[in-house]
C-alpha cells in the first residue's frame, strides 16, 4: 500500500516570464497519489531563525518538500527510476556460519541484530543477513503476507539460494538535508546545488525564481557492468556488479529553455538513445502532450489559466480512440466487423458510434457528459474483451495480477487499443473463429452501451460520467473493519477526468469505475501575485473526523479552488487559525 501511496504520477507545467501576462514566472505542481483519508500530504508553514518556507510535506518530515521560500519555488514528479537491483545469491551453511559465493570464493554473510519496540509488548529482536550486495530478503519474504494478486513464493534461509537487494539507502542518505538546503536557497545556483544532494528519491524537480525556470532529474543512478536490472541477476559471477553512480552532471536538466516553458508528467523526457538509462517505466504521453498543447498556444498566461489547466479534463487518449473509430482505414475495418454482428448487438454498437462521433463528444471527460460515460465504459469493456479469455475471470490469480500490473506505468490496454493492430490477445480463445482488433472493438462498443444501460438507465440522454465514476474517500479503519463508515468516510462525489487527463481521476480499466488516484495536492506559485503561493491538499488537513478541517478541502478540490498561503508574518497571523510554537 505504501508503494502505491507514495510513488504514483504527477504533472509539472512551469512558465518563464515571457509566457505570463505579468512578466514573471509561474511554477505549478500537482502530485497524483492514491485517493486516501487521511491525506498523505499536509500543508505546512515553517519558520525558525535559519529557515522560512511554506508548502507541503509528509507528516513527520520537518522540512518542506514542495513549496516556496519567498525567492525560490519548486515542485516535483516521479521519474520511476530503475534504482534497485535484486541479486540471486548461492548460499550455504558450514557449522554455524552462513556463506555466499562470489567470484569462486565463499564469503561470510554479515549478520546484525535489529530491535523493534512495540507498544504494549516486549521488544522484538531479529537477525538481518547481508551480502556485499545488500540485505538478504529470504526471512522477510518468509513472514510477509502476500496478497493473492502477487503470489511471490517465500524463500527460506536454508535453501541454496538467497535474494539480496542493492539500494543506495543501505549506505546512508542525505536527501532530507538536501531538501532543507533547497528550502534555504536564495538563487537558482543554490537551488541546483541543494538538489544535487537528493540521492534516494528519483524526481523531476522543477524550480524557479521570478525571472528563471529550471528542471533537474535527481538521484544516484547505478552504473551497471552488465544488464539493466529489470530481472534478478546472478550474484556469484561478478558480471552484474554496480560500478559507482552516474555523476550529477550526466543527469537530464534544463534552464530557461527556448520554448519558455517546461513540462514533466512522468512521460519520457529524454530520447530513446539518451546515453543514461533512467527507467523502463515511462508513462504514456497523453497528459504531457495536452499540457504542451495548452502551453504552446499562448504567451500571456495568468494564474487563472494555470488553475484551469490543472483542472483540465480533455482526454488525448479519448481523441486517439475517436480517430480509430471514425477515420480512414480503421473506421472501415470497424464497420466491416460490425456488419457480422448479431442485429441486436450491432444496433447497440451503432448507437455507441453515434454518441462518440466528433460532433457529439468533444473528448472532455466532464462529470455530466454522456459521451464521457460511454468512453469510460468502452475502456472497461475493451480491457475485459481483450484479456479475460486468456487470463480467466475476476477471481483468477492471473486476472488479479493483470489488474494490479495495469495500475503501474505500462498499460496493456492502451497498447492494444491505440498503438498496435497485431496481437494474439485480440483472438477470443473461447470461440472457434479467429478475431482481430476490430472484431473485439465492435464487441466492446456493444458491451459498453449495454453496461451504461444497466448502470445508468435506458435513456442515454440522462447518462452522466459522474454517476458512474466517483470519488469516495474511505478511511483505512472503515475499509478494514467495516466500522464507523458514516463517521470516517466521505463521499461518493461525482468525478470527471480519467487517468489520461491533466486533472487525473484514475480508475482501473476492466475492474470498476472507482477513482483510486487523484491530485492529492495542487500548488501554484505565481511570482506576479503579492502572495504567490496557492495550494490545496485533498481531502483535509486534519486527521480527526470531528475537526472542521477533516474534509473542508473537498469542496475546493471539486470546484477547482485554491487556498492562498501567505509568507509575510502579519498576513500569516491573520490567515491561520492555529499556531504551534516550539521552544528549546
Q: Locations of the language-model features?
A:
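Mature extracytoplasmic enzyme cores
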Residues: 1, 6-346, 358, 364, ...
